Amino acid sequence: MSQDFVEIAKIGATYKLNGELNLYPLANSIETLLSYGDWYIQLPATNVWQQLKGESVLKRADKVYIKLANINNADTAKKYVNALIGVPKRALPQLAEDEVYFKDLIGCSVKNINNDSFGVVVDIIETDANEVLVCKEDNSEYLIPYVKQYIVSEDLNSKKIVVDWEYDY
């Protein structure tokens, strides 16, 4: 399959002897995760996405479990531990002009208005107040609030972000 996929969940440890697995959403909420149509799976150590044949997805309190078709015991289910669940990028909702998917920020190079480099975005921390870009350059890590007052420009096609931020903030 040549289409781009977006990771929406990761499979965790087996949950029951009948082959159920823990499912960890990477989406903002369990409801968002469950709203996507067809899911695809990428097994550990492969780059191949295959359509997922799920038997059921169960939501219990704040946990989600998945039962894959034709997987009826924990031993067989173990090969799916750490697999990724994804959807085709085209399945995601269109964003407004000033919105981005956080996953598109990962890997962007970050420089300030003085052309000082903060490295690349390796993670995004979600806090109650705002999101924070985690940038790494060599052995240094920088935390930059992802708010309009500090973001001068973003070019996601070129994977470049310019910020109004200094090393000593």
From Swiss-Prot:
The keyword rRNA processing applies. The gene is rimM. GO terms for biological process: ribosomal small subunit biogenesis; rRNA processing. Residues 97-169 form the PRC barrel domain. The PRC barrel domain binds ribosomal protein uS19. One of its GO terms (molecular function) is ribosome binding. Keywords: Chaperone, Cytoplasm, Ribosome biogenesis, rRNA processing. PANTHER family: RIBOSOME MATURATION FACTOR RIMM. An accessory protein needed during the final step in the assembly of 30S ribosomal subunit, possibly for assembly of the head region. Essential for efficient processing of 16S rRNA. May be needed both before and after RbfA during the maturation of 16S rRNA. It has affinity for free ribosomal 30S subunits but not for 70S ribosomes. The keyword Signal does not apply. Belongs to the RimM family. GO terms for cellular component: cytoplasm; ribosome. Binds ribosomal protein uS19. This is Ribosome maturation factor RimM. InterPro entries: PRC_barrel-like_sf, PRC_RimM, RimM, RimM_N, RimM_N_sf, Transl_B-barrel_sf. Signal peptide: none annotated.
